[in-house]
Amino acid sequence: MARTATIVRETSESKVELSLNLDGTGKTDIDTSVPFYNHMMTALGKHSLIDLKIKATGDTDIDAHHTVEDIAIVFGEALKQALGDKRGIRRFADATVPLDEALAKAVVDISGRPYCVCTGEPEGFEYCMIGGHFTGSLVRHVMESIAMHAGICLHLHVISGRDPHHIAEVEFKALARALRFAIEPDPRVDGIPSTKGAL
């Protein structure tokens, strides 16, 4: 069964068209209307090996927040849809990823219970403007939106970092690598990886 999803979400603030394939090679085609977010979502697809296509427009003349949030919501929904009943996946994974002076660790449980803990971002990071359109505060908001709508438990910890671009990027890459292993089929698991029999 193909682990794919396509979702279109349109509101008065944005229109998001997104498709993904969990069993891809990291091929991406990203146009979020927010240049730095293009970079982040491209990295997320590349390093998770999820084929990811996004076309989004929104009221970025007001602020990038609505469009960025809505893309994260749709990505989470698509991830949940593509995972189906989660039969045969590894479920748990973690990844620690460096980028020069920045280092972050992501731990993921594809549990069906949404939870997100983000820690370690340096004081003032949330106020940094990255790439002219993307504030540091949006990183946590993206992570929370993905976790809530995908139904996953995510712990993300920034261990070190100075450059706001590097800090944001390493958070996305750590999530990507953790997802890459958590969603991967485990050849030793035949059913649903839970003592409850459902996730």
From Swiss-Prot:
InterPro entries tied to this protein: IGPD_sf (IPR038494), ImidazoleglycerolP_deHydtase (IPR000807), ImidazoleglycerP_deHydtase_CS (IPR020565), Ribosomal_Su5_D2-typ_SF (IPR020568)
Biological processes, Gene Ontology terms: L-histidine biosynthetic process
MF GO annotations: imidazoleglycerol-phosphate dehydratase activity
Reaction(s) catalysed by this chain's protein: D-erythro-1-(imidazol-4-yl)glycerol 3-phosphate = 3-(imidazol-4-yl)-2-oxopropyl phosphate + H2O
Subcellular location: Cytoplasm
Record flagged with keyword Repressor: no
Pathway: Amino-acid biosynthesis; L-histidine biosynthesis; L-histidine from 5-phospho-alpha-D-ribose 1-diphosphate: step 6/9
Keywords in alphabetical order: Amino-acid biosynthesis, Cytoplasm, Histidine biosynthesis, Lyase
One Gene Ontology cellular component annotation held by this UniProt entry: cytoplasm
Pfam families, per the entry: IGPD (PF00475)
UniProt-listed Enzyme Commission number(s): 4.2.1.19
Top EC class, one word: lyase
PROSITE patterns: IGP_DEHYDRATASE_1
Superkingdom assignment: Bacteria
UniProt keyword Translocase, yes or no: no
Matches recorded under SUPFAM superfamilies: Ribosomal protein S5 domain 2-like (SSF54211)
Chief location of this protein within or outside the cell: cytoplasm
UniProt record similarity statement: Belongs to the imidazoleglycerol-phosphate dehydratase family.
NCBIfam families for this protein: PRK00951.1-6 (NF002110), PRK00951.2-1 (NF002111), PRK00951.2-4 (NF002114)
Name of this chain's protein: Imidazoleglycerol-phosphate dehydratase
Organism, scientific name: Bifidobacterium adolescentis (strain ATCC 15703 / DSM 20083 / NCTC 11814 / E194a)
